[in-house]
Amino acid sequence: MSEIPTVVTPTKDYKRLQAKLDEIENTVENTNAEIIQRTGKKAGRDVGIAYGLAIGFIFVYVLGTVLPLFDLIK
């Protein structure tokens, strides 16, 4: 039977490479977090615009209905 080949790396090299990989992973995580945060801000802005328009239309409709009533009261 054939044996599974194994590789032995020096501990110092392994730790150095592991530290570099951790640094790269941290950078990637921060970049992804910033991208997701920007996407969230854009979505929040769009939802805010939609709510603003809806409330504005309701406000204009209510004022259009209520203001003529004040003319009748005079």
Curated annotation (Swiss-Prot):
Its main location: membrane. GO terms for cellular component: plasma membrane. InterPro entries: THM_MeTrfase_su_G (IPR005866). One of its GO terms (biological process) is methanogenesis, from carbon dioxide. The chain crosses the membrane at residues 47-67. It catalyses: 5-methyl-5,6,7,8-tetrahydromethanopterin + coenzyme M + 2 Na(+)(in) = 5,6,7,8-tetrahydromethanopterin + methyl-coenzyme M + 2 Na(+)(out). It is a single-pass membrane protein. Keywords: Cell membrane, Membrane, Methanogenesis, Methyltransferase, One-carbon metabolism, Transferase, Translocase, Transmembrane, Transmembrane helix. It comes from the Archaea. It is an enzyme of class 7 (translocase). It is found in: Cell membrane. HAMAP family: MtrG. The complex is composed of 8 subunits; MtrA, MtrB, MtrC, MtrD, MtrE, MtrF, MtrG and MtrH. Part of a complex that catalyzes the formation of methyl-coenzyme M and tetrahydromethanopterin from coenzyme M and methyl-tetrahydromethanopterin. This is an energy-conserving, sodium-ion translocating step. Belongs to the MtrG family. This is Tetrahydromethanopterin S-methyltransferase subunit G. The gene is mtrG.
